[in-house]
């Protein structure tokens, strides 16, 4: 019963923020969301979970305090609480910094890898997907008030590079996915400078891919690369799905992740942001290295093990229709990209 109440609080907090036009109610939704998710992060109770929940609380509380401070400053200078009406440059800058901290974007990304490493995969799934929606909604609305889009461009490039370099030599899957999240969010923030609609489309597709990889890891009960190398012994189908989704996260054709990078690159080049596109692609090449390394180790290598584990491949496997649909969207959405572009009327 308590878990259901907390899940309802997370849902209501996010919805309140996403559909609010006032900074006060947006802040209130963020607070409801934060107070609901922290007790869930403590289960199962352990020293690592307690440490991660404390880090998450401090970072989110600082960000929320900055948001209410900046929105109050904007109210005193302009008399407006409306999110879409931001006239004070100091207030806009403070709110952008606060949203960067909430999203875990560079240069304020320090908390995200440590928090994800300390929680279980189920909470990692929520933090990496659902918890991104409310701050991203606010950031898209605030970005329309920016006179200088180079702020978003700088944040985007720093996040992609930080995610790429941070993911190198990681052996823990949750930390690796945290740096992957930082890198992909950098791409989404970058396209905000030229197209809000495209940023929404790429956000939804990325969250679907991220949802898929976390559900596969939960199914395989893998938190380290060595665990993933033995996943073939549990279920070969989930093992294959994991490899395909990793390649999609890396942005290789013909998978869905390639559509994200192709559409964003095309939109940026159409707006003469060629240097930014080159930097984003360079950062993605770094990320692609550890995706390919992980796929190679998962598909072709075998961690040191004993003979008993090689007989577990007949373990019962129960398929879930929703998870399978998410998996298909994660790897096979590229042929539908022309339809999606026309549907959302994206300006390339």
UniProtKB/Swiss-Prot annotation:
Major place of residence: mitochondrion
Transmembrane segments: 1-21, 23-43, 56-76, 92-112, 123-143, 148-168, 176-196, 198-218, 242-262, 272-292, 321-341
UniProt lineage: Eukaryota, Metazoa, Chordata, Craniata, Vertebrata
Protein name (Swiss-Prot/TrEMBL): NADH-ubiquinone oxidoreductase chain 2
Species assigned in the record: Myxine glutinosa (Atlantic hagfish)
Compartmental location: Mitochondrion inner membrane
EC number: 7.1.1.2
Enzyme class of the recorded protein, top EC level: translocase
Bilayer topology term: Multi-pass membrane protein
Job of this protein: Core subunit of the mitochondrial membrane respiratory chain NADH dehydrogenase (Complex I) that is believed to belong to the minimal assembly required for catalysis. Complex I functions in the transfer of electrons from NADH to the respiratory chain. The immediate electron acceptor for the enzyme is believed to be ubiquinone.
GO molecular function, one term: NADH dehydrogenase (ubiquinone) activity
UniProt xrefs under InterPro entries: Complex_I_Subunit_2, NADH_DH_su2_C, NADH_UbQ_OxRdtase_chain2, ND/Mrp_TM
Catalytic reactions of this protein: a ubiquinone + NADH + 5 H(+)(in) = a ubiquinol + NAD(+) + 4 H(+)(out)
Family listed: Belongs to the complex I subunit 2 family.
Keyword annotations: Electron transport, Membrane, Mitochondrion, Mitochondrion inner membrane, NAD, Respiratory chain, Translocase, Transmembrane, Transmembrane helix, Transport, Ubiquinone
């Amino acid at each position: 019963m308590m878990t259901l109440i907390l899940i309802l609080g997370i849902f209501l907090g996010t919805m309140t923020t996403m559909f609010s036009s006032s900074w006060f109610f947006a802040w209130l939704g963020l607070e409801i969301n934060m107070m609901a998710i922290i007790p869930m992060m403590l289960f199962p109770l352990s020293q690592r979970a307690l440490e991660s929940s404390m880090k998450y609380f401090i970072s989110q509380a600082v960000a929320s305090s900055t948001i209410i401070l900046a929105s109050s400053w904007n109210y005193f200078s302009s008399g407006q609480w409306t999110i879409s009406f931001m006239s004070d440059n100091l207030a806009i800058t403070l709110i952008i910094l606060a949203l960067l901290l909430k999203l875990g974007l560079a240069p304020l990304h320090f908390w995200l890898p440590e928090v994800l490493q300390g929680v279980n995969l189920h909470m990692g799934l929520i933090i990496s997907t659902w918890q991104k929606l409310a701050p991203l909604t606010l950031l898209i609305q605030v970005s329309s008030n920016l006179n200088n889009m180079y702020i978003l461009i700088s944040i985007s490039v720093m996040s992609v590079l930080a995610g790429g370099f941070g993911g190198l030599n990681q052996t823990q899957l949750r930390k690796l996915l945290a740096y992957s999240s930082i890198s992909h969010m950098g791409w989404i923030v970058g396209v905000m400078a030229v197209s809000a609609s495209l940023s929404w489309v790429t956000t939804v597709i990325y969250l679907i891919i991220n949802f898929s990889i976390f559900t596969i890891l939960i199914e395989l009960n893998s938190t380290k690369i060595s665990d993933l190398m033995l996943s073939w012994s549990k279920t070969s189908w989930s093992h294959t799905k994991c490899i395909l989704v990793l390649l999609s996260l890396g942005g290789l054709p013909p998978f869905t992740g390639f559509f994200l990078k192709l559409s964003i690159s095309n939109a940026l080049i159409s707006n003469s942001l060629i240097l930014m596109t080159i930097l984003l692609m360079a950062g993605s090449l770094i990320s692609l290295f550890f995706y390919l390394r992980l796929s190679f180790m998962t598909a072709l290598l075998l961690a040191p093990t004993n003979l008993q584990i090689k007989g577990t491949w007949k373990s019962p496997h129960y398929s879930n229709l929703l998870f399978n649909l998410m998996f298909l969207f994660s790897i096979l959405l590229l042929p539908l990209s022309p339809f999606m572009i026309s549907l959302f009327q994206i300006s390339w």
